């Protein structure tokens, strides 16, 4: 049973009840009650639950629903948080807020979300939108279609989410209401406003013309503090064990590190490479970039909805609607890390003697400077004591203790807008009913990403992960304070050998981007009622959609002159700095020269520390010794421009440069045509009413992609060396077309008036992510090797869509108007799906007969998922007053991946988990709704799940998220005589946190999104 006003659809609402059964509130009556009250909080939760139940019983396939009254009584501020209450829905959260949902284990990109019949558009490269853009105050109802009927737009393999906002002719009387609240986040220690205004009337100027305006403004502060072990890899042998960490069958007979000296090879270089491959078997796992991060977001959100409806005639109603959502965000990211990406960062033994054919060895880490557990995972270590020159005497390149500590700071705007324009009509012609809609939707994202990075040299840092959470605790020498900005400009710090450690100047970056997603749609639906003992209605319709995805990420990829390798200017800017006592010049290209005095003054001016609550406030089981604050350089343009030329830190070159348009990072033009016909069934079988439908949907998809085609060659030079040069860089265009026929069958058997059995079978599809379709191609022709194919990375416009067959049965019992008990089983067979980052040989990339070795997304086949869902709700009306106001709702879902056909790229073994699928999900809620008091306490839980199939930054391992459970609550005191309510609500009462990990020994990220409180007042006239 969904956590909110939701119950599994099992029976038609017009089913006749037995004489002594309480009569439920039908959908129309319940929604009239809600509308008459003109206040989504004042209306009782009980009536809303009854309305939601009836709404689902009337649906033509298996549906869960939430109505607006019930949403408003939840502690939810966006659609995603409300959807988490639905059976089988698993919510993805970012900064504590719901962003997207998996439905029955199917990832967000494969679920369709509609707002008033229009696709929710996203400008972030995927098909899943961000639920944070739409406030729940705008919403009238949400329907989650888990089954499929052919009158639904295809695209939701997991399910289809239909969001409907309020319409003016739904009102019976004029409406004017406002809500003012303040919200607090415990980690940010700020109070920010949230304001809602709603006004509408069913009669505006003339009879039949209705207007409704709904506006919500919210100023949201969010913050997440991360403790991270990132970039897990095997760089060196820390424990000197003879047990292999990962065995290589090519070197099965070499059972010690020292024995690898005998591997040999045809040349010294080959022998060294072979010896390293042998020694790698003994390398231990260690995080090479342990770090602390604090990410702060200030997000000013505006959601506005204007709806007009006009009753032209008793049988003809037209409408027009505009919805605008704006998010103006300021992102402040502080990343504090220790660089362990080279073996010189550790304290090393002398290298072993050269082996067969001169093959050299990689030095082992000194015993006593680290600890390693039984699974060959490093749990603590000490970094290098001195700077190590890995360059030459003439051109030194310092490593070891040099520049080992770094801090990066971003402080930039990130704005997202979406706009939806819809218009249409409903025309009733006796037995023929026609619906027509036209729409235009557009989403844009503009990013002004910048960065300042500084580093410094520190000797002998201890990193200890031997704690319950496995997270790094940094211990620095006594003279180094990570919360003091001045440590970055200290020119006197020395290593253990007494030599002064080098100091490095700052690096600056600017990475602008613009992206948009536009959809135009025409949609026609018709119902024709007929007299027939079995078929009650024929439904048919057609749809045409045109969608354009485009993104620009700085550009500069067009090769203007191959002879001189002159490229188009890029909007990206990268500056480095050199500190010299007496620099001969201020600037050489993108390198700037500053004096030690200038650098110290700069750090003094831009140095700062984190605000708000102490670092890692609220994080459960955090070990002692982690810092409460860290120092960082502010990206202060006024100060930085006194040294650096920041005139290019703008959007001027993002779209065009050198008189030519930039090649987009991706451009996908997609056209979709669809049509359907469906017969509605209404008959009797053995005295039991049988309703349902059977239909067929035809759809055709045409994709055209534009990206970048870069051709490079590695060749032998005249002096016998090798060089890699770019031969060409140009636009690449590839297209693809595919057609599908999607049958669907739904049946609903009323065994008794209170007991119904539903069944569903359907085929459905979901289209690949636009970024997977982009023909971005980067090929290398290595002419120094004979008999080998060119190697390319590329998008894959030839990707087949996700195609699935689904089955479901559901049994539901409605003993009275307030009670529902439901049990269902479902199965999904994904005939084709998409696997990212697969390397294949023999690929005819350009369809010209020439084959390449290509790393790209490819299709996988044959995944099989199933699950069991159970839900229930009731109101304790049988209890004596005042306890008759109590009620409960709850649901539980068990889901499994029977077969995934996925591979763990790190081990080569089978990957049994399916992305986004939690084995268990459950919701529980208790509410009280009577008189002046409305209160609810809600808990949402999901067990651990696979979040990433392959993470290249962490040894190609899959990444998992730990189980999470969130407790939310709200109390409303109602004073209808005075037309106002007051409320207090809290999210994440239990201070839940998130953890990303590879396995129990190898955590990646641990972070806490904070606990949020709202205090507010609602008034109604």
Regions found by a protein language model. Name each.
Residues 13, 27, 38-74, 108-111, ...:
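N-terminal periplasmic "start-of-domain" segments of outer-membrane beta-barrel proteins
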Residues 80-119, 146:
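Extracytoplasmic beta-strand/coil segments of soluble accessory domains associated
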Residues 825-830, 834-841, 845-949, 990:
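Gram-negative outer-membrane beta-barrel transporters
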Residues 118-147:
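Short acidic/polar hinge/loop motifs at secondary-structure boundaries
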Residues 416-418, 670, 736, 765-824, ...:
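Outer-membrane beta-barrel signature, preferentially recognizing the C-terminal barrel domain
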Residues 79-82, 99-102, 114, 130-132, ...:
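N-terminal periplasmic accessory domains that precede
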Residues 940-950, 972-1021:
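C-terminal beta-signal and adjacent terminal beta-strands/loops
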Residues 34, 168-175, 204-209, 315, ...:
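Short loop/turn motifs that connect adjacent beta-strands in outer-membrane beta-barrel proteins
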